[in-house]
């Protein structure tokens, strides 16, 4: 025997005797919910028992569409690296549904209790009654599935490097369609456990929250998904909620028919770009520090971008090159977000919009949630006012525009001897005061009195023009008053 062959044989013998298990493929070709061979429950149990990387669970189309596996009790958590694939999607685009309605009983969101007694539904802390559970596991792929009628469709808890792609996530009325959370089990965030997950090319329909990034979820990518809600949704809250989630990227998604398209609660350094938000009460509903909103299309909402006051007076939110138009619609949808205050100031970018933590919020704060009036936050309305939050983004003032012979003059009033970036926007309607088309930018520097003035000539002719300003720390103002160019 050659020496090389001997070494290979000894290696193979060593792997066998050491208990090494090769990656396996488990085929699901029975839709009964039992532990017999061929069921989904059996396949998950088998994969969990095999410690090898990259097992596969291939779910076959059985019978005629729609293909539905109705589970009668919670499925076991996924504990091994595995690809769970509905095989029909690659062939016909059909999803294979995993449906929890056989054991999750009750009326809408009330069937989904929260972690605290008496609370229920989407807008409370919960990890109750999920469909597929990825807990303390890495390297899981979900594809070609419709995860349907659970309280949480997919729970990704303290897990990293997982991929959720080409699925439909539908009618999950508790926490979210997909919940990505670093929750330690007691409501506390964990900062390094829930990273680098990817949620791509999915359709989210009629979930309470479409997706959540909470309690330490960081460096995750959410891209090219549709988040939509219909009249069938009992609690249309947020397309995405980020709560104490940092450094995530949300790119190229569409959000429609929610209270908020996307809501950030005290998350930091998230990058939100190239999304479209329409027919929401609020397009963006924001707090947090270092978050950047770049080149989004925000139209047909009650308010385009709402920046809330918060206890951190130094928090800064950056808005750049966003296209904002046709807002001011009468959309009063307020499930832990949105805008239902009757006399609320409307527009493209509005500071100081009240949310559920604020005095003056009108709407639901979550099922069974009661906040003592003394604990509600207030937004300062007068200089030197006490016991209230400062105006967002340090109250940075919008620039002032004037026009003469189709040349704009911009005046900025700010901190002395500081750099400011001014962005200009055009509107096709002369009566519009929003930011339909990004036209360009200039940098100005204030003098010792905090004043700067500059001239700028747009290269594109638009009936009306607005501008906003961003300071060197990243805080962006509301829009200026519009000037007519014709």
From Swiss-Prot:
It catalyses: 3-dehydroshikimate = 3,4-dihydroxybenzoate + H2O. GO terms for molecular function: 3-dehydroshikimate dehydratase activity. SUPFAM superfamilies: Pectin lyase-like. Its EC number is 4.2.1.118. Keywords: Lyase, Quinate metabolism. It comes from the Bacteria. It is an enzyme of class 4 (lyase). Pathway: Aromatic compound metabolism; 3,4-dihydroxybenzoate biosynthesis; 3,4-dihydroxybenzoate from 3-dehydroquinate: step 2/2. The keyword Lyase applies. Converts dehydroshikimate to protocatechuate. This is 3-dehydroshikimate dehydratase. It comes from Acinetobacter baylyi (strain ATCC 33305 / BD413 / ADP1).
């Amino acid at each position: 025997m050659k020496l090389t062959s001997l070494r290979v044989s000894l290696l193979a013998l060593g792997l066998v005797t050491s208990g090494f298990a090769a990656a396996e493929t488990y085929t699901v070709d029975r839709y009964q919910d039992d532990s017999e061979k061929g069921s989904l429950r059996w396949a998950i149990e088998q994969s969990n028992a095999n410690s090898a990387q990259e097992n596969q669970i291939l779910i076959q189309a059985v019978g005629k569409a729609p293909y539905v596996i109705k589970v009668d009790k919670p499925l076991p958590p996924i504990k091994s690296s595995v690809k769970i694939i509905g095989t029909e999607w690659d062939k016909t685009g059909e999803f294979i549904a995993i449906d929890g309605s056989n054991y999750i009983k009750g009326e809408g969101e009330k069937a989904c209790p929260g972690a605290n007694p008496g609370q229920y539904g989407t807008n409370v802390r919960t990890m109750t009654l999920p469909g597929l559970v990825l807990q303390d596991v890495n390297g899981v792929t979900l594809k070609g599935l419709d995860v349907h009628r659970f309280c949480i469709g997919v729970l990704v808890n303290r897990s990293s490097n997982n991929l959720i792609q080409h699925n439909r996530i539908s009618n999950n009325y508790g926490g979210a369609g997909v919940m990505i959370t670093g929750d330690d089990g007691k409501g506390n965030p964990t900062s390094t456990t829930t990273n680098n997950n990817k949620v791509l090319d999915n359709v989210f329909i009629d979930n309470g929250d479409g997706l959540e990034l909470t309690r330490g979820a960081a460096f995750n990518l959410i891209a090219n998904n549709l988040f939509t809600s219909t009249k069938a949704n009992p609690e249309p809250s947020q397309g995405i909620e980020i709560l104490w989630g940092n450094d995530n990227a949300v790119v190229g998604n569409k959000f429609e028919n929610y209270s908020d398209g996307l809501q950030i609660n005290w998350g930091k350094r998230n990058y939100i770009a190239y999304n479209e938000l329409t027919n929401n009460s609020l397009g963006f509903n924001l707090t947090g520090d270092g978050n950047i909103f770049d080149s989004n299309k925000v139209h047909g909402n009650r308010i385009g971008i709402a920046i809330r006051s918060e206890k951190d007076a130094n928090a800064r939110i950056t808005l750049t090159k966003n296209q904002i138009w046709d807002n001011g619609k009468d959309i009063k949808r307020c499930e832990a977000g949105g805008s239902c205050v009757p006399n609320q100031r409307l527009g493209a970018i509005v500071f100081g919009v009240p949310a559920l933590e604020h005095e003056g919020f009108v709407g639901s704060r979550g099922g069974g949630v009661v906040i003592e009036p003394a604990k509600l936050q207030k937004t300062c309305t007068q200089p030197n006012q006490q016991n209230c939050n400062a105006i967002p983004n340090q109250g940075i003032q919008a620039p002032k525009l004037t026009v003469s012979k189709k040349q704009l003059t911009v005046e900025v009033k700010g901190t002395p001897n500081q750099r400011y970036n001014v962005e200009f926007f055009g509107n096709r309607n002369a009566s519009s005061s929003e930011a339909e088309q990004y036209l360009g930018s200039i940098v100005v520097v204030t003098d010792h009195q905090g004043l700067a003035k500059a001239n700028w000539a747009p290269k594109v002719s638009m009936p009306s023009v607005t501008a906003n300003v961003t300071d060197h720390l990243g805080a962006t103002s509301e829009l200026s008053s519009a000037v007519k160019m014709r």
